[in-house]
Amino acid sequence: MADIGIDQKDPYFVAVKVFLEDGGKLFIFKDKFGAWDLPGGRIKKHEFQTPLHDIVKRKMSEEVGDVLQYTVETMPSVLMRHERVESVPGNPTVHIFGLGYRATRAGGEVVLSDAHTEMKWVDVNEFKPEEYFTGGWLDGVREYLKLIKK
C-alpha cells in the first residue's frame, strides 16, 4: 500500500454536542450569529487528556448555566461530521467531528450564555430539524430523532 503523506489527511476539530430532552421535548438554541445549535462545542487543546464527560459538563455550564440539572449517558448516541465557515478574519472553512450525547433534564432552568439569543424546547414528534439545522448537524439531529423514535 502506498504511503499517504500528512497533506492527504483531513484535520478535524472535535466537538461534544448534547441532545438535552425533557418530557418528549428537545432543547435547541440560537447563537449570536443566527445559527440554531445544540449545547456543546469544541474540545480545547489542553483538554486532550480530560475525560469527555468533564468536557460535556464544562460546555453545559458555559452555555446553559449551572442551575440546570441533568443526567448524561456515558457513551455517545450519534456521531456527526460538520463543515462550517468560521467567523474570524479570512473566514476559513473547518471540519468538525461531533460526538452527540443524550441527556435528560432532571431539574432547574436553562440560563443562556451571552453567546446565545434564543432557546426552544421542541416536540421530538413534530420537530422539523431542516427548518433549524444545516449540514452535518442536521444529519446528526435527524439520526438522533430516528434513534429515539424506535
Which sequence ranges carry the predicted segments?
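Acidic, metal-coordinating catalytic segment for phosphate/diphosphate chemistry
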Residues: 1-19, 23, 90-91
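Short, well-ordered beta-strand micro-motif
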Residues: 20, 100-104, 121-123
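Conserved Nudix-box catalytic region and its N-terminal flanking loop in Nudix hydrolases
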Residues: 24-66
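Short helix-loop capping/hinge motifs at secondary-structure junctions, enriched
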Residues: 26, 108-112
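Nudix hydrolase/Nudix homology domain
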Residues: 34-36, 111-150
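Active-site segment of metal-dependent pyrophosphate-handling enzymes
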Residues: 65-109
